[in-house]
Amino acid sequence: MVGNAVPRKRPSAGRGHEITNVRIRDVAERAGVSVGTVSNTINHPELVRRRTRDAVQRAIRELGFVPNQQARVLTGASSQVIGLIVLDVVSPFFMEAARAVERAAQEAGHVVILCNSDNDPAKEAQLLQMLAAQRVRGVLLTPSSANQSLDQDWIRARRLPMVFLDYQNSPEDCSVSVDDVAGARLAVQHLLGLGHEHVAFIGGGRGLRQHVERAQGARDAIAHAGLDPATALVEVSEPGLGIQDGLSAAHRLLEGKLPSGIFCGNDMMAFGVYRGLALAGVRVPDDVALVGYDDIDFAADWIVPLTSVRQPTDQLGYLAAQLLLEHSSGDVEHVHRQVVLQPELIVRSSSGAAR
């Protein structure tokens, strides 16, 4: 039971009267309930009837009561904090997803701790242990490329609710992801439809599930068109996911016969490819058609507006957070769901017809 609060002054009815700290019993008196009911509303809201819960929460707001999170942890209660572990916090894709997660959490009266794994399984494990020790309500996780099989026994032993973000794990877990194979097919089919029969796929984060599946989608589209992926598709893999990796990939492509259509595993790499081609005097879209993935905010405002596969990133983050809050509520009717969202191709100026 929570018996303490972070000191918060409340004024009495008039000037000159004593100012006291708001205590949990003050909230109980204001709401007309017991101290235990206030404690349950804070720690286990699913156990309290909605009308009673609303009355307690109204009293908390009116009095300015702030529950002592440290005391809650000591009693074994989870906090009103959820953890979010992503591969790269500066990635526009993950930034947009994180905003959606935060919005869903805020609507439920929770806050988010955003953590960066740097696509490193050791760092990821440390972050999971830290969040578990803080008794967060649950964790949203995009696993690193080298950690595709998580230690589920460790997670379940600590009863740490988890939802996988932009990743499918198993039917025993909740997950929200996007069909990356289908997205890549859309991109390459678009290039083939423009007459490009020699296509490159540039992926990053070697071994990263998303880019492995996008490579598979590119091969599927080539094969479905009756072409041989061994000759019609050039695959380039870079260690990272940024502009410099795209620039490096462009230099590698320029060393051989340059494909007339290039599909990149994300928009940031596509920007790097554009820069590398421009430095070599190769024009987009006149000489090479270029397609990205993610449709980040400034794809439409690039030097040559970028054709890109749009992911429903906002929906991805918001729905994942909702699933986590539902999963961590202890609701016996909760059923683990694996939600797969569909991407769409946004055609702009960077992809022109083959010459």
Label each PLM-derived region with a short phrase.
Residues 69, 87-96, 114-123, 145, ...:
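Hinge/beta->alpha junction and helix N-cap segments in small-molecule ligand-binding domains
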Residues 251, 255-355:
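Flexible loop/turn connectors
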Residues 30, 35-39, 74-90, 190, ...:
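Short beta-strand segments enriched in small/hydrophobic residues
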Residues 1-79, 354-355:
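N-terminal helix-turn-helix DNA-binding module of bacterial transcription factors
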Residues 197-199, 229-233, 283-289:
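Short acidic capping loops at alpha-helix termini that bridge into adjacent secondary structure
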Residues 1-19, 77-189, 193:
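Alpha-helical recognition/docking segments in bacterial nutrient-uptake
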Residues 34, 137, 196-198, 259-260:
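Short acidic/polar active-site loop segments enriched in Thr and Asp
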